């Protein structure tokens, strides 16, 4: 009778124990799959090129980031360059596509969103753990044909759900609510084409959907350079 009782308890407990993988365990495995905390933390600055495609229109871009401090994005479309910069708690932009040729301060909501991007792409969960953002394990589900773990992260700029591949523990996707120009919208990103880069494994393609955009946007990352010397003057707002 005792053996039967132990067997019964084991069978009942098995689904609970299988499901009870914690957010901390998932994040630790994600960080390990990315290359490890030491490798991620060692990146203080980085630059990369972007190829951007939306609705048959192709653009190119270059980004420079000083982790947790500054970011500059330059995007060229139809022969014109759009620039967006955040430096500390301030930001500015030049957008000739909207008739602007002189720098303008970034609105507060755009500033807040851009500040959330001042880290190495694909390392969001490392950042969430390091900054002690509230994290909740929602459960295991499907993202397309992949089994994924759903982690809800409350970031300063909004709530984001990260979908972690249950096999590779790499970030497969992210859904977030973002408020821009007074409008709250749902952003969806799919991460793919992970590649090894100096001991790190990072996504090099991102498919982004946002109801405010005319269609899906695809970003392809290339020419990543870690820890280049960055001149602080590139973040200064032109006079």
Region spans (language model):
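Flexible, processing/modification-adjacent segments and terminal tails
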Residues: 19-32, 39, 93-158, 179-185, ...
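N-terminal mature ectodomain segment of secretory-pathway/periplasmic proteins
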Residues: 24-99, 137
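A residue-level signal for beta-strand positions that form part of recognition/binding surfaces
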Residues: 45, 132-134, 218
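Structural motif
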Residues: 54, 77, 143-144, 197
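A short, sequence-level motif marking secondary-structure junctions
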Residues: 63-70, 87-90, 110, 165-168, ...
């Amino acid at each position: 009778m005792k053996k039967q009782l132990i067997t019964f308890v084991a069978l009942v407990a098995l689904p609970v124990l299988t499901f009870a993988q914690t957010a901390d365990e998932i994040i630790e495995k994600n960080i390990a799959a990315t290359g490890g905390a030491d490798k991620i933390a060692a990146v203080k600055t980085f630059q990369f090129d972007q190829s951007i495609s939306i609705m048959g229109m192709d653009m190119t871009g270059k980004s420079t980031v000083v982790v947790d401090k500054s970011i500059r994005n330059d995007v060229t479309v139809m022969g014109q360059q759009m620039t967006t910069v955040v430096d500390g708690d301030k930001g500015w932009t030049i957008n000739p596509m909207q008739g602007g040729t002189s720098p303008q301060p970034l609105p507060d909501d755009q500033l807040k969103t851009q500040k959330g991007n001042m880290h190495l792409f694909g390392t969001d969960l490392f950042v969430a753990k390091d900054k002690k953002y509230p994290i909740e394990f929602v459960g295991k589900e499907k993202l397309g044909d992949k089994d994924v773990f759903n982690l809800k992260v409350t970031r300063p700029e909004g709530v984001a759900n990260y979908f972690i591949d249950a096999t590779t523990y790499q970030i497969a996707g992210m859904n977030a609510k973002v408020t821009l120009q007074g409008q709250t919208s749902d952003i969806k990103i799919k991460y793919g084409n992970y590649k090894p880069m100096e001991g790190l494994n990072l996504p090099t393609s991102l498919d982004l959907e946002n109801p405010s955009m005319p269609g899906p946007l695809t970003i392809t990352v290339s020419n990543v350079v870690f820890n280049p010397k960055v001149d602080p003057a590139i973040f200064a707002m032109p006079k």
